[in-house]
Amino acid sequence: MEITMTTAYYRHKYCPDTSYLRPKYIYIPKTPVRKFFESLIPPQIIDSEKWTDLHLAVGYKNIKLVQSVCNKHNINIKDAKGRTALELAILGDNLEIVQFLVQNGGVVAPNNMYGWSAIHLAIKVGNLDIVKYLYENTKFNEHDKYGLTLQNWAEKVGNEQI
């Protein structure tokens, strides 16, 4: 009998070498915020991306909603692509939410799956206000995983004014 992905999945208890195929689920409760977003975004997408209420609120760019769902226990949780709420706020070009997340424990220093810290991402996006805020108010890794400095990054992405 040939073992395919399907049979290996169903037989994971009997095939220890295929235990890595077991799906990893994270339980996310159905809060009022989550129900609201499920009316806008298909629930399958929310679940597959592993978005929390905070990720959704940051994506919606609503500071009051971010403040209401934010707590220090979930502020640095990553989604399926390894992005924190702070990184999503930087990608969304929203300084007010970036400031709120940093003041409430959003971590800038850990690198994402590409080896960039949040300040590298801000340089790539090109928002001078966010870069300045992160530079003055946070601790960060000056070099990415390839050894490039912040200045190298600015030149590489064409944002020399940073």
From Swiss-Prot:
Q: Which InterPro entries match?
A: Ankyrin_rpt, Ankyrin_rpt-contain_sf
Please indicate which superkingdom the organism of origin belongs to. Answer: Bacteria
Q: Where are the ANK repeats?
A: 49-77, 81-110, 114-145
Keywords for the protein's UniProt record, in alphabetical order: ANK repeat, Repeat
Q: Which SUPFAM superfamilies match?
A: Ankyrin repeat
Q: Which SMART domains match?
A: ANK
Q: Which protein, by its recorded name, is this?
A: Putative ankyrin repeat protein RBE_0151
The organism encoding this protein is Rickettsia bellii (strain RML369-C)
Q: Does the keyword Cell wall biogenesis/degradation apply?
A: no
A single Gene Ontology MF term assigned here is: RNA binding
Q: Name one GO biological process term.
A: RNA processing
